[in-house]
Amino acid sequence: FTHKIETIGEMSCNPAIGGLGKGHLVREIDALDGVIGDVADKSGIQFRLLNRSRGPAVRGPRTQTDRSLYKKYMQEKLLNYCNLSVFSDPVIKFVFDKKSVKGFITHSGKLIKTSKLILTTGTFLNGLIHVGDNQTPAGRYNEKPTTGLSEQLKKFNFKIGRLKTGTPPRLDARTINFENLEEQCADDDPYFFSFLTKENLNKQVSCRMTYTNDEVHKIISKNLKRSAMYSGSI
């Protein structure tokens, strides 16, 4: 049960999979027959093995991802997965019998009975977006959060906390002079996430790097108090 089937696989924050401390987790999920590694490989547009010059223990596979392709392939995976039914009807309340969960009630008023329930919160459980001075309840940009479930869980002594992720502003490629930027190419021998992936499906795209200067630092320092991280909002 989810808010919208058409937003399954929407990448809430940065369009990348893996990285240092995370890439090996994606491969472990793949080893357990999870789908994220396969979908990441099919939608990857720049594969790099980070820390390649160092020992194997600190290397981290990462791919920059085509967001549209990732969503497309993830939906195809889930909507055709054996013994999995997907419904657009968010859960608004758990149903308990003493201390055991017995089901849930959906936004449309349906009572679904179950002996086991897996809550996949993502960024939606009491989600809150900070943009400068402004705060907006949201699961992700322009999507409503899930409210009420946290309060129920607190009554059963679940510890409820909040995790933070930062999303950099998006830049319009048409406004950038790439000739003045340092090119960072994809690896010639891509390190895939899934053990089943044999070849790359997409044209690889270079990243571009630039650097700050004193003027940029002045702008940051002048406006630092407006950042949610430094104003005390987070």
Please provide the spans of the model-predicted regions.
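Short acidic/polar mixed-charge low-complexity motifs
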Residues: 100, 108-110
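Active-site helix-to-loop segments that bind/position phosphate- or nucleotide-bearing substrates
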Residues: 223-234
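Conserved N-terminal/central alpha/beta ligand/cofactor-binding core
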Residues: 1-95, 108, 116, 120-140, ...
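Conserved acidic residues
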Residues: 102, 115
